[in-house]
Structures are given as C-alpha cells and as structure tokens.
Amino acid sequence: MVLQAIGKHALGVVLLLFVVFLWLISSFLTSSLLDDDNFFSPFLITYINTGTFVFYLIPWYFSEKKTRKHRLMSELSMYESVHDSSFNLGTRPNSPLGFRQTAYLSLGFCIIWFAANYFSNSSLGFTNVASFTIISSMSGFFTLGLGTIVNVERFTLSKLLALMASVGGVIIVVTQDAKQADLNDSPPSRPALGNAYALLAALLYGCYSVMVKFHITEESCVSTRLFFGLVGLFDLILLWPFLIILHLYGVERFSLPSTTAGLIVLIINASITFVSDYLWVIAMLMTSPLLVTVGMSLSIPLALFFDILLKGHYLNFSLILGSLLVFAGFIVVNYNQQNII
C-alpha cells in the first residue's frame, strides 16, 4: 500500500514537470498575443482557453454510457454498506462525487479559475514580466496558509523555509535576468495596477488549488473529464455577456487576431491549456496543492535556460544560485510530502 502511494506520488511529480513545460510554452504564446497592439484581449483569451474544456464532456458521455449500469450497482452496494455500519461524521467521505456535486464544484472552480487566469493575463499588459513573476511566486504562501486552515496541508517549518528559499530564488533569477533585458523595452504602462492584478491572481490560484483538494481527496473521487467538461460549459454559458460589456465600455475589443499567425498561436495556446490544466489537476490530487504551486516556479529557471539558448543571455553566479534555490525548495517540499505518505 505504501509502495503504491509512493508510486502514485512519483507519477504526480512527473505529470507536474510536464505541465510546467507546457505552461512555459503557453506563457510565451500568451505574451506574444498580448504584445499585438491590435489584439489586447486577455478576457477573450481566457474565455477561449477555458471554453475548450467542454470537449471533455464527449469522452465522459461515451464512458458514462458504457459503465452506467455497473456504477449504479456499485453505488447501491456502497449505500447498503454505509447503513449497515457506523458512520463517522468527523471524516469526509471518499466516495465518488455524483453529477450534481461535481457540477457545484465545477461552477465554483470555473469562477475562481477564470478570475485567476484573467487577472494573470491582464497584469502582463500593465506591468513588466519581472514584477509579475516575483509576485506570482507568492501564491505558495497563500496555498500553504489556506491549506493549513482547511487541513489539506500540514504546516511545518521546513515547508515554510523551502517556500521562502523558492521565492528568494525566483527574486534573484528574475532581477538578474531583467538586467540583461533589452534597454529599448518600453516601460510598463500602469505598474501598480498590474502588480495588484498579479497579487490577486496569486491569491486566487491558492484558493482554487486548495478548494479542489479539499473537496476531492483523491483522483478516483471524481470524474475528471466531467469536472473539466462542466467547467468549460459554465464558462461558455455564463461568461459570454462580459465579452460584450467589456467591448462596449472600451476595456478590450471583442475581436480575433487580425493575422493568420495570430489565429494559429491562439489555437495552439488553447490546445495547450486544454491538456495542461487537466494534467495539473491530476498531478495536484496525486501530490499536494503546495507541491504543485512550488513546482510551477521551476518554469522560471527553465525559461532562463531558453533565454540563454535563444537570446544569448549569459550565466552568472546569481542566476545559478537563484535557480538552485528554486530547485531546492521544490525538492524539500516534495521530500516532506513523501514523508507524510
């Protein structure tokens, strides 16, 4: 049983590392879209990306159709066993969530997840990447704090120190890398607003990570396809009026990219989100909200590696130290999580 849990945790870490790579690519694509002065539409980008989740309802429907009879018999057996034994009100049941329960969870997740991604995308339009990255890394503190309150994370001093090391490494890498940036880059238009958006996105990221783990203790407790499919459905049904409102008030234009290249980037970015966020939830359920939050900081030294290859940025001691701190923070949190297993 212990070996099985360790194996599941290891698989979750592998999935997380793959998600980090996908999100890194997505961030570059999103940045390229927002750099287009004729297409500054963070809400539309988030709406399209989230809306793609509705396609998960297709495989869920056919799978549900095949297994409905067997599932109903299993639920009946579980119902009878519960009434034949004592029921502990102090524990949360691990039985699979039904359609209605999953729908309620998907609705709450859709709103918080959409808001987090919208504020994250919007902040890039008002502040510089360095400030955005540093502030976003603070989501680990929100995740640890909220997770401890609702008992999905166990607070330890080593976790706090690992988190501080990771954030410290992020600050070192980002500030050093910013010194090598092109001096011709235009300054941020509204840095205070952009930084506030980034901080709000970090808080919301911690909220939805903890919320999902609190309601779904293991990946077997919910149909992930149904969960994400309903998130996409709620996104398409409930949020489209805001596209028109934002357009009418001049906040952002309701239009697609004007170039073929822009459309291709938009589609590829949505496809990456379609896969990566599904795998992110599975990785989080196999590990912990804090581990996936700290794990996302690994994208920063990875992005630095790409900058060295593609833009000719050079390594120095500070960049190496910062990267090592980020990796060390991830390793310590992962070690703590394995000890809990």
Swiss-Prot record:
<feature type="transmembrane region" description="Helical">
    <location>
        <begin position="10"/>
        <end position="30"/>
    </location>
</feature>
<feature type="transmembrane region" description="Helical">
    <location>
        <begin position="129"/>
        <end position="149"/>
    </location>
</feature>
<keyword id="KW-0812">Transmembrane</keyword>
<keyword id="KW-0333">Golgi apparatus</keyword>
<dbReference type="GO" id="GO:0000329">
    <property type="term" value="C:fungal-type vacuole membrane"/>
</dbReference>
<keyword id="KW-0926">Vacuole</keyword>
<keyword id="KW-0472">Membrane</keyword>
<feature type="transmembrane region" description="Helical">
    <location>
        <begin position="313"/>
        <end position="333"/>
    </location>
</feature>
<comment type="similarity">
    <text>Belongs to the TPT transporter family.</text>
</comment>
<dbReference type="GO" id="GO:0005794">
    <property type="term" value="C:Golgi apparatus"/>
</dbReference>
<feature type="transmembrane region" description="Helical">
    <location>
        <begin position="155"/>
        <end position="175"/>
    </location>
</feature>
<keyword id="KW-1133">Transmembrane helix</keyword>
<dbReference type="GO" id="GO:0022857">
    <property type="term" value="F:transmembrane transporter activity"/>
</dbReference>
<feature type="transmembrane region" description="Helical">
    <location>
        <begin position="107"/>
        <end position="127"/>
    </location>
</feature>
<feature type="transmembrane region" description="Helical">
    <location>
        <begin position="290"/>
        <end position="310"/>
    </location>
</feature>
<feature type="transmembrane region" description="Helical">
    <location>
        <begin position="42"/>
        <end position="62"/>
    </location>
</feature>
<feature type="transmembrane region" description="Helical">
    <location>
        <begin position="226"/>
        <end position="246"/>
    </location>
</feature>
<feature type="transmembrane region" description="Helical">
    <location>
        <begin position="263"/>
        <end position="283"/>
    </location>
</feature>
<feature type="transmembrane region" description="Helical">
    <location>
        <begin position="192"/>
        <end position="212"/>
    </location>
</feature>
<protein>
    <recommendedName>
        <fullName>Uncharacterized transporter C405.03c</fullName>
    </recommendedName>
</protein>
<dbReference type="GO" id="GO:0000139">
    <property type="term" value="C:Golgi membrane"/>
</dbReference>
